[in-house]
């Protein structure tokens, strides 16, 4: 029997581990991406991925570490694309409005992505830690410039992210008016201290189109396809 080169064997082992990890993430994405996905258990993910429970614990110590990684995968690229646009906007009012509208529109366009975020977000921010920090900084800037009237940036951040969470669920359950995201953005800005006239104008401003977010249909990018072929 021919001996496999140790270097090649190690490479094959790394690739198998990568694909198994990707399969677990992809399975978690599909399970949490259901309407009632919040009740997903480790056993459900293992069954969906076609792996033993012991294999799961080789990669994750429990459900929480998996959810943290899933959240990063689901929000990383989209956060980056949104941030590129937000940096071009002139002030905190414009950025806050655009951010909430982008995410709410994406929730409607990609409901599995939306449900996965909602169902896996218990105990953490809906759109990830990076956006939480960005929201806090934008709110603080708005307070400093007098655009927002709030007792503190944390209050504004929680108003924004809380509204985003609740509105996402409403949109996912539907039906809602076509301009529901704009209605939420308008009332949100008013709640932050922006005048009604300006809030209405900003919340309905045309948004720049983002690149097609293909990753939203698959939380682990293209790795799942390779993992699927491994199982054939």
Residue spans for each PLM region:
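C-terminal peripheral helix-coil segments that are non-catalytic and often amphipathic
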Residues: 1-8, 137-144, 173-232
């Amino acid at each position: 029997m021919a001996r496999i080169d140790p270097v090649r064997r190690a490479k094959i082992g790394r690739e198998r581990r990568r694909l198994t990890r990707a399969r677990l993430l992809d399975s978690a994405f599909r399970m949490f991406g259901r309407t009632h996905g919040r009740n997903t258990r480790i056993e459900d993910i293992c069954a969906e991925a076609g792996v033993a429970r012991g294999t799961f614990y080789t990669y994750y110590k429990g459900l929480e570490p998996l959810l943290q990684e899933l959240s990063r995968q689901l929000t990383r690229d989209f956060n980056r694309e949104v941030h590129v646009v937000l940096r071009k906007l002139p002030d905190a009012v414009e950025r806050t409005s655009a951010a909430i509208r982008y995410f709410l529109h994406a929730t409607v366009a990609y409901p599995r992505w939306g449900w996965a975020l909602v169902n896996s977000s218990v105990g953490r921010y809906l759109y990830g830690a990076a956006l939480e920090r960005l929201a806090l900084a934008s709110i603080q800037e708005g307070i400093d410039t007098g655009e927002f009237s709030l007792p503190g940036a944390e209050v504004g951040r929680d108003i924004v992210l809380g509204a985003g969470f609740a509105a996402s669920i409403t949109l996912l359950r539907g039906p809602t008016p076509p301009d529901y995201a704009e209605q939420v953005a308008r009332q949100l800005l008013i709640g932050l201290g922006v005048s009604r006239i300006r809030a209405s104008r900003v919340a309905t401003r045309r948004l720049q189109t983002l690149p097609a977010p293909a990753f939203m249909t698959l939380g682990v990018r293209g790795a799942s396809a390779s993992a699927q072929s491994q199982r054939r």
